[in-house]
Amino acid sequence: MEMVNIKINNMPLSVPKGISILEATRMAGIEIPTLCYLKKINEIGACRICMVEVKGARSLVTACVYPVNEGMEIFTNTERVRKSRKMTLELILSTHDRKCLSCVRSGTCELQQLCKEFGVDDEGRFDGANPVHEYDDSAIHMIRDNGKCILCRRCVAACQAQHISVIGANARGFDTHIGSAFERPLDSVACVSCGQCIVNCPTGAIYEKDDTAKVLEAINDPEKFVVVHTAPSIRVTLGECFGMHIGTNVQGKMVAALRRLGFDKVFDTDFGADLTIVEEANEFLGRVQNGGVLPMITSCSPGWIKYCEHYYPDMLDHLSSCKSPQQMSGAIIKTWYAEKMGIDPKDIVVVGIMPCTAKKFETKRDDQAASGYPDVDYSLTTRELGRMIESAGIYFKHLPDEEFDNPLGDSTGAAVIFGATGGVMEAALRTAVEKLSGEELKSLDFTEVRGTDGI
């Protein structure tokens, strides 16, 4: 790899030729603020927050798209740079809905954080036209509020990366806004509910539809028996909501928090995952032995199912007919568990804590109520659960570790790997191979299906 010699804030540095100034400064331990940049996904220099000074250049340049070259001298924190960034933030705020106190992203908003860092107050020097912005709450899983949109286009890039492209930049000039084709509401376009636009939005312009109030209402209803079950990935992501290190396993504290929120039973979705493993393995064996449609594709992701329905309907016969662990858990709770406990299913409210907004859509599908009742009534994201715990005044870090309730709190290690790429297929293969061979596996690992080739 060819290297070039540059200086960043008078500090000499050798970096690969052709990388952006932003990448070079990060290699040097210097952070340049951005609002639109997503590496290899959205490198368009739209927000203009990352402007830096380059010796010999007539104007400031955008660090995220400007390549380094031999002898370049870069300055990231001059008075000219700071003034430019502050003015850009003021201009963004001039047309921004500044209802920060009631915004779901208050405290985690990237725009809010940068305004704080650069001393930009709520008043501002500029007064924008503040046009009427679209507010779209038609979808089951999310809300779009263009009043908080800063036109960074991260959501557009994320949607394109998923090969969906249901949102884009509409109109031109000052009237430019993010929307779907022909300004159609989200519930009438081919959105797969994956939520990647939500994850990548730097502000509160796109966010998950909050069902916490409905869940709390059910908890406070003495006639309702409210059961919650949590996906395997939640236990290693929830801690981030409370300032804990990324990936910290907080399973015990999560269970304790859910009990303190008032849930009657706290179960593990891994139990449903084990059921899914057995069902999918048997379905696969049935297809192999009876000349069924092959290859069989696992179907635990409702976003993947919706993607297939919209874009590849000819592949639907290849999908496993098994429900996802979320829905299997709900179905078991409202049938077998209800019968064992002597509870009328109509009085049971099942809540799933899931990592994906597509799970919200899944709970409302017509084919997910075979017992006459919805398998799962509400699906909450990690963020929603985090807000519930905070609003209840629960000091999460100081909670004791507690265990899931039996019997739907027990599971195998195969269920846990559902949270990893290829985990569903690998878990099903373990069962299928043992059934075909009649022997216990010597090795549980099927690394070929993990999708890590080339990584």
Task: Tell where the protein language model's regions lie, with residue ranges.
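Structural motif corresponding to the C-terminal cap of alpha-helices
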Residues: 163, 201, 337-341
